[in-house]
């Protein structure tokens, strides 16, 4: 019994040293296990085109679909960035999309990232000039522009906008947390480290 306890303690110490070594030489390795990064080339390509942080797009994709391209929500949102077909039609019209069928095309990972990135850039531009513009863009991505516009109109000048939906407040906080994790784990691959 005593030998087994000593062996267990030695094994735990060796495991702890191994963990510390890997954590020191490969920072963020544990984050990469929990939070994968797929479609890196599409993410990096479109964020440069739309002037966004690649960690932000990776975080939104993770939060929306966990990088599952064939994801479909109960509300009808489709693909990696969970775009509604009606939203995607509007994006297609603004970006020159032709012969666009949202019921099928939104499952294409590259197109979904392109449209989702464009939409997020559009929302950031729409709310630019406000100190909480980044949060408002994420809130609008999650809850819709009409809700955010209403919240803004109900907010006294100079005050931060109060997001009325708890799920949307959680969404914004979760995306911010994920952005920091993706920067830590993949900053070198995303160019945002």
Which residues are covered by each model-predicted region?
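Hydrophobic membrane-insertion alpha-helices, especially the h-region
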Residues: 4-22
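Catalytic glycan-binding domains that act on GlcNAc-containing polysaccharides
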Residues: 19-193
């Amino acid at each position: 019994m005593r030998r087994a306890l000593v062996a267990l303690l030695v094994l735990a110490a060796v495991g702890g040293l191994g963990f510390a070594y890997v954590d020191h030489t490969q920072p963020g390795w544990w984050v990469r296990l929990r939070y994968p990064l797929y479609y890196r080339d599409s993410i990096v390509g479109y964020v440069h085109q739309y002037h966004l942080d690649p960690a932000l797009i990776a975080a939104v994709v993770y939060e929306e679909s966990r990088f599952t391209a064939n994801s479909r929500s109960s509300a009808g949102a489709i693909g990696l960035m969970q775009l509604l077909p009606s939203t995607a039609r509007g994006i297609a019209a603004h970006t020159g999309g032709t012969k666009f069928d949202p019921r099928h095309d939104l499952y294409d990972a590259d197109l979904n990232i392109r449209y989702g990135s464009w939409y997020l850039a559009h929302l950031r531009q729409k709310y630019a000039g406000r100190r909480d513009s980044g949060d408002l863009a994420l809130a609008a991505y999650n809850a819709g522009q009409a809700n955010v516009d209403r919240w803004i109109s109900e907010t006294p000048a100079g005050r931060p906008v109060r997001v009325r939906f708890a799920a949307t407040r959680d969404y914004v906080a979760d995306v911010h947390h994920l952005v920091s994790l993706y920067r830590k784990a993949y900053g070198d691959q995303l160019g945002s480290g």
